[in-house]
Design a protein with these regions (language model features):
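Intrinsically disordered, low-complexity Pro/Gly/Ser/Thr-rich segments with frequent PxxP/GP/PP motifs
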Residues: 80-127
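A structural signal for short beta-strand/turn segments enriched in small hydrophobics and glycine
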Residues: 246-248, 304-316
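Asparagine-centered strand-capping/turn motif at beta-strand->loop junctions
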Residues: 57-64, 74
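Acidic, glycine-rich catalytic/binding loops that coordinate metals and/or anionic ligands
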Residues: 164-182, 190-194, 224, 241, ...
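Short histidine-centered loop motifs in beta-beta connectors
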Residues: 241, 283, 287-310
Length: 394
C-alpha cells in the first residue's frame, strides 16, 4: 500500500512531507554546529575546569528567530544542565560573522548566521561528559501549517561537540618571577578570545587561549621612565624559551620595534607583519607553539632547527601590531598563525604570585603600581592554565 502524502509550502519552497514520519525527526528552523569538532577541558589557576569553543548558528526559517536560552548538557545525562546562558550572559556571547556591527538583540534574521562564544567552568572534580549537547529555547518559524510570519516557542537539543581527554602539558615560555597574563582566557569580550578571523575560506579562533605576557619589576610596575621607550619596560629583552622539544617551522626577524604607548597606524599592518618578528615551533601531534612580537635580529634559531625544551629562541620585543613590549604566546593546530584553531594547554609547574584587578587595568592599562594584587606567599601549581591577569613565577 502506498504511503499517504500531502504537499505543504514551507519557507517559500514546497516540501513533500510523509504523514508517517519517524517520531524522532523534528523540524529545527534554527540550526547550529560547533565551529571545531572537539574541545578540551583544562584546569585554570582558579581551580576550575574551563571549556571554551564556538557554535555557528543559522536561521533557516522565514521568521526572525529570537534566542532565549542556550543550555549545555551532557549527551549521557541530558537532564543535567552544566551551563546556562540567558539575558546578558547570552547576548554578550553572540557575534556576527566577520567584522559586522555589535549585536544588540539576540535575534537572527532569515538566512542569517551568528557565532556564539561558549565558555563555562566546572568544578575540578566534576566528570566532563565525552560529548556535549546544546539545548536551545527560542522563538522561531513554526511547523507546517503555522502562520508564515509568526514565531513559535520551541525547545530542542542539537550541536554535539566531542570533549577530548588528553591534556597538552607544556613548559613555560619565559623564565623568572612576576610574569603577568594579559588578554588571557576566557571572557567572550577579551581581545584574544573574541577575535575570529575569516582566513583561507574558514573562520578561525587561533587566539582562543592566547596570552600576552608582561613583567612586573621589583616595584610592581610594568615600566619605569619614558612610556615611549621600549627599554623602560621590565619585560623588554627577556629571553623567550621553547615550551617543548620541537622543530622550527617558521620565523621572521626583520621588523623594527614599534613606538610604545599606542597601536601603530592600521594602514601599516598586514597579515604578514601583524604578529611582528616571530617563531613557530612544531612540537608534534599537530600542535604548534607560536611566539610573537620578538626583537629584530634577536632570533637564535632558523627554520628547520631542532630545539630542546628551555632553549632560548630569541628576545622579547615590540614588533608588529602592539602598543607595548610583551610576548604573545599561543598553541594552535596548524602552521598558520591566524588560519589555525587555538588549542588549550597547561603549564607543568609554576607559582601564582598574585591576581591583578581588572577594574584597575581598565582604568590605567599598564601604568602605575600593582602591588595590591600580589600575594604575600605565592602558591605552587601543577598542570594548570594561567588565567587573565594572574601573576606567575616561572
Amino acid at each position: 500500500m502506498r504511503t499517504a502524502r500531502f504537499l505543504v509550502c514551507l519557507s517559500g519552497a514546497c516540501l513533500m512531507v510523509a504523514l508517517f514520519a519517524r517520531a524522532e525527526d523534528k523540524l529545527t528552523p534554527v540550526i547550529a554546529a560547533p565551529l571545531v569538532p572537539s574541545t578540551q577541558a583544562v584546569v585554570g589557576t582558579d581551580g576550575k575546569q574551563h571549556l571554551v569553543y564556538e557554535l555557528v548558528i543559522t536561521n533557516t526559517g522565514t521568521t526572525t528567530a529570537t534566542l532565549q536560552t542556550i543550555e549545555v548538557v551532557g549527551a549521557d545525562a541530558p537532564t543535567k544542565v552544566l551551563a546556562k546562558f540567558e539575558g546578558a550572559a547570552l547576548l554578550s556571547r553572540i557575534r556576527t560573522a566577520g567584522h559586522g556591527p555589535e549585536v544588540t538583540v539576540p535575534q537572527i534574521e532569515f538566512s542569517g548566521t551568528r557565532l556564539f562564544l561558549v565558555d563555562f567552568t566546572l568544578d575540578k572534580d566534576t566528570r566532563v561528559p565525552a560529548t556535549l549537547l546544546h539545548r536551545f529555547h527560542l522563538l522561531a518559524a513554526g511547523p507546517p501549517g503555522s502562520p508564515k510570519d509568526q514565531a513559535v516557542a520551541q525547545t530542542y537539543t542539537i550541536a554535539p561537540i566531542e570533549v577530548g581527554t588528553e591534556v597538552t602539558v607544556l613548559g613555560p615560555p619565559l623564565a623568572g618571577k612576576g610574569w603577568t597574563a594579559f588578554n588571557g582566557c576566557c571572557e567572550a569580550g577579551g581581545v584574544h578570545r573574541g577575535t575570529g578571523l575569516s582566513v583561507n575560506g574558514q573562520i578561525h579562533y587561533a587566539q582562543r587561549f592566547a596570552i600576552d605576557w608582561l613583567l612586573l619589576n621589583a616595584d610592581a610596575q610594568f615600566f619605569h621612565g619614558d612610556e615611549k621607550d621600549v627599554k623602560s619596560y621590565a619585560c623588554y629583552g627577556a629571553k623567550v624559551i621553547a615550551v617543548a622539544d620541537g622543530t622550527v617551522v617558521d620565523t621572521l626577524s626583520t621588523l623594527d620595534n614599534q613606538v610604545p604607548g599606542q597601536l601603530p597606524d592600521p594602514k601599516t599592518i598586514t597579515l604578514e607583519n601583524v604578529d611582528g618578528n616571530h617563531v613557530v615551533l612544531d612540537i608534534g601531534h599537530n600542535k604548534y607553539a607560536f611566539y610573537a612580537h620578538l626583537q629584530k635580529d634577536s632570533l637564535l634559531v632558523s627554520k628547520g632547527d631542532h630545539v630542546k625544551r628551555g632553549q632560548v629562541l630569541g628576545l622579547l620585543g615590540n614588533t608588529g601590531n602592539t602598543s607595548a613590549p610583551h610576548l604573545h604566546f599561543h598553541l594552535m593546530d596548524g602552521t598558520s598563525v591566524l588560519g589555525s584553531s587555538g588549542l588549550p594547554y597547561v603549564i607543568d609547574s609554576f607559582e601564582v604570585a598574585g591576581q591583578l584587578s581588572s577594574e584597575q587595568f581598565k582604568a590605567s592599562e599598564v601604568q602605575g603600581g600593582w602591588s595590591k594584587g600580589l600575594y604575600p606567599h605565592p602558591s605552587s601549581r601543577r598542570s594548570e592554565f594561567p588565567l587573565d591577569l594572574s601573576v606567575i613565577n616561572f
